[in-house]
Amino acid sequence: MGCLNSIRVLGLSAALAFAASPVIKVDFDMSGRNSSEVTEPNYVPWVVSGVSSKDTSLSGVKVNVSGSGNLKANWYKAGVQSPSYARLVCDGVMVEGGGAITLTFSNLAAGTHSLLLYLNNVDGTAVSNSIDVYVNNSKQASVKPTNRALSTGEAAIAYVTFNVGGTGISTAIKLNTGTVTLNGFELNVPNAAAQATGPSPADLDYHAPHESGALTLSWTAAKSVVKHRVYFGTDSAAVLAATPSNTAVYKGEQSGSSYKVSGTTPLQTYYWRVDEVDANGTVSAGNVWSFKPGRVAFEGAEGYGRNAVGGRGGKVVYVTNLNDDGAGSLREACTAEIGPRTIMFKVSGMIQLKSRLVCNQDYVTIAGQTAPGKGITIKSAPIGFTGKDMVIRFMRVRLGYGATYDGMGLTGGDHSILDHASISWTIDEAFSSRGGKNLTLQRTLISEALNIADHQNYAAGTGHGYAATIGGDIGSFHHNLLAHNAGRNWSLGGGLDGNGYYAGRLDIFNNVVYNWVSRVTDGGAHEVNFVGNYYKEGAATTLHGYTLRAQFEGTGKGSQAYYYHNNILEAAGGKFTCDGTNDNCGREYSLSGGQVLDWEPWNSKPFFASYATVQSAKAAYKDVLSDVGQRMPVLDNHDTRVINETKNGTYSMKGSVGGMAGIPDRETDVKDTANIKGWEPYPSEIRADDYDSDLDGLPD
């Protein structure tokens, strides 16, 4: 064994409290994926694929991973995704065709070190063999890997401690025998098998649910423990170092695995730790977890994106010109890697984008209401919001005929909210939120998607005036107005999870839809609340009698079902086809693709809470028409007209190609209230330099 004289393996002893350094945590990631999708928070991502050996250097330690053959990245996609989000243990590195993996550490300081290895098979093949663990060619243990465990606490681990005789000595840890998937490792940490796991609220949850500051902490106890010591406070270092003598932080010893706290505030981050005590009195120190109680992003924010953090506490960044890119532009403000920010505007007018603008940074607020004049209008290319914890308010997109683009989107977003936006004259579709989670789209006006506008993926003359394809887990879509769009009002794009099961949970309530052509709400998702929506036929409407048409297309496994309640359908003449009292009215489903319906498609109660005030359809109709679209700093002529046409059941133009009432094919088909075709004037106004001289976001 050379200089290695101490080995400890999972299940043979309690954890040691290590003071060795450095502490290194590595997550072997799936290749070709965004780090936010596959990397466990607080771990260093490492993608190893297509090579037999790869080096990295972390905190002065050289780490090499090598295989008996070519290494490849692999994953269990469904485990990485919702609802498990097991990003640490549901991907990893393995040898193509099976074989040994060796980790070699160089430049470690002399003394005792520990290594924790995660061994969870991800490829779906049941592994019957145990994995032999060697240290410097000496077999120390055999560990049976788990197969597609869906949490870190459930995954198999190996834990060893070893002595290093000097800084020039390398230590090799070899995993041998059969199929080995190495998900990640942790150097110089306690034994996870003896620690509490599965914290709730989850570690780093900055949207923790609470009732007036009260919430319950809970965890999964380690095996064979009899007591738990709870530490709780607002100083991470104090919680980490605390002992039972620290009365301000130590909350006592208990047998249960939950602890109630009160008096918390969203303005504070909280830290807690649970030490496990076994029957012999051995204490295993726990990790320090943190959370922050959820806080409503702004007054009126509702639904699953209501607690988006946005740029709170970060920098204030001003947009000072209407350029596509460069200093002072919206693009630079969105994409610069400067951390949390609130984007405000010293300029108003029209920004003509030369290409798609993707706002991919986390913790960003875009405050369109701070612009002078008529606010900010974007044309020619779309703007999308893919970061997490984004708050976007009072923005306007009027795309126009040209390249095949959409308008706005929350695709892939997390804990984000888009509020009081206006989107029109798009060619692909106005809005999309596929792959997002914890989202809200509210009080947004989607109108006049260009219909026969030479979409690049379709034959000439094909209509594609579509409002939105929505997905999410969970996505809230409420108090929006969809007017003069031929179809996809909404298209439900729940998609499939990594196992091929129907996915997506959507909360669709209190929306107003007016003057569609042949498609209302269709498509499908796993669970949908569809409540209190108001559908009003117009002069272009050819599909009568429906608000929701569920399509079971045989593309996946599992089920798609709907809670359908209090939805109104008003015919073009003003009579009610469905007055909201009969929940069998206005809905249907269709089967295709060999789909066998072996479940009940209509649920008798909501699938999940809405975290919003849900109105009746009639009340929502009045509410939406009085408060929708980019109303700040001012509602423009276009939106004023569309709202009035919805209210009065009218239209003011026909498409120049398709000839359909209220359904444009070019933006020049449209005249505003001042009889101007296409874009109305959006004058450029610039605030004086002394408007906010200290750049704190508050006018002087």
Per-region residue spans from a language model:
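Acidic Gly/Asp/Thr-rich repetitive segments characteristic of extracellular carbohydrate-active
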Residues: 298-343
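Extracellular beta-rich repeat passengers
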Residues: 491, 502-674
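Right-handed parallel beta-helix
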Residues: 363, 368, 388-399, 414-425, ...
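Extracellular beta-strand-rich solenoid/capping regions of secreted or surface-exposed proteins
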Residues: 211, 331-339, 350-367, 375-393, ...
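Recognizes extended acidic, P/S/T-rich segments that occur
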Residues: 229-267, 279-287
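Compositionally biased, intrinsically disordered or flexible polar/acidic segments
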Residues: 20-191
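Extracellular calcium-associated, cysteine-rich motifs in secreted modular proteins
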Residues: 674-700
